[in-house]
């Protein structure tokens, strides 16, 4: 999943230096950047780390001339990360009228993508739990974007959020939270109650109408932009599943 961008204030160069474990990949990146740079007004000397996530993907920010102050580069080694779902879902979101990073260039062989930059400020950065009414316009925007996304849904386009996937994700709760975080053995009555509850959840979800599901639709993945709709990130794991999933 995509980590939040680094803070709005520019970090020191040492904090954003790009390190490469593979010199050949580093050379391929430099060659690719030099090749696409002129068409997009990129300034290669300004490339720096923007964020990383729990996968093998990394994101760099690079300055550009003209109206685009900066662009984002995704580094997704193809032997570790498949970029095709990201490209597909970015296109689906654009078709639905949802603001997501536009894929400007894609080196499929090496897994390098040039994206437009939706900024540094997430919705999580600006909402104030102590003043819920002040955050209502942002939540309204988020719901509007979600509705547009759902209304564009078509079966057979995205992978199904089927029983196997639901059960796999539910199993994370007893394993990681109850077992590892709380140190409680999942057995006896606890196990029976969980299994009974999980069966109800699975059946309820499978009986719901199916739409496009982002799967990580939350404030840290929504970008606040002055005078524009919220931008949506971290959508590459989207599926076709229960209509209630994202809004929950």
Describe the role of every protein-language-model region:
Residues 216:
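Conserved catalytic-loop position in the HRD/HxD motif
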Residues 210-212, 224-248:
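Active-site Asp-x-Gly
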Residues 2-42:
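Juxta-kinase regulatory segment immediately upstream of eukaryotic protein kinase catalytic domains
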Residues 29, 36-38, 154-160, 164-165, ...:
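An alpha-helical support segment within catalytic cores of ATP-dependent transferases
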Residues 42-60:
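ATP-binding glycine-rich phosphate-binding loop
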């Amino acid at each position: 999943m995509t980590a939040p961008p680094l803070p709005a204030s520019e970090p020191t160069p040492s904090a954003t230096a790009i390190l490469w474990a593979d010199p050949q990949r580093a050379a391929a990146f430099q060659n690719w950047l030099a090749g696409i740079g002129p068409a997009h007004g990129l300034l290669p000397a300004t490339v720096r780390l923007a964020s990383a996530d729990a996968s093998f993907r990394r994101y760099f920010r690079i300055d550009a001339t003209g109206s685009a102050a900066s662009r984002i580069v995704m580094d997704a080694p193809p032997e570790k990360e498949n970029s095709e779902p990201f490209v597909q879902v970015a296109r689906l979101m654009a078709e639905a009228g949802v603001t997501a990073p536009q894929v400007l260039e894609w080196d499929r062989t090496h897994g390098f993508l040039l994206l437009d930059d939706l900024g540094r400020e997430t919705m999580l950065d600006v909402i104030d739990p102590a003043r819920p009414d002040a955050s209502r316009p942002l939540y309204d925007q988020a719901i509007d974007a979600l509705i547009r996304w759902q209304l564009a849904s078509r079966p057979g386009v995205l992978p199904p959020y089927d029983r196997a996937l639901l059960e796999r994700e539910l199993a994370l709760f007893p394993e990681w939270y109850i077992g590892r975080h709380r140190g409680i053995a999942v057995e006896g009555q606890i196990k029976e109650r969980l299994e009974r509850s999980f069966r109800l959840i699975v059946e309820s979800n499978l009986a719901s109408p199916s739409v496009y599901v982002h799967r990580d639709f939350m404030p840290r993945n929504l970008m606040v932009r002055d005078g524009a709709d919220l931008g949506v990130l971290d959508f590459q794991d989207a599926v076709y599943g229960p209509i209630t999933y994202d809004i929950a």
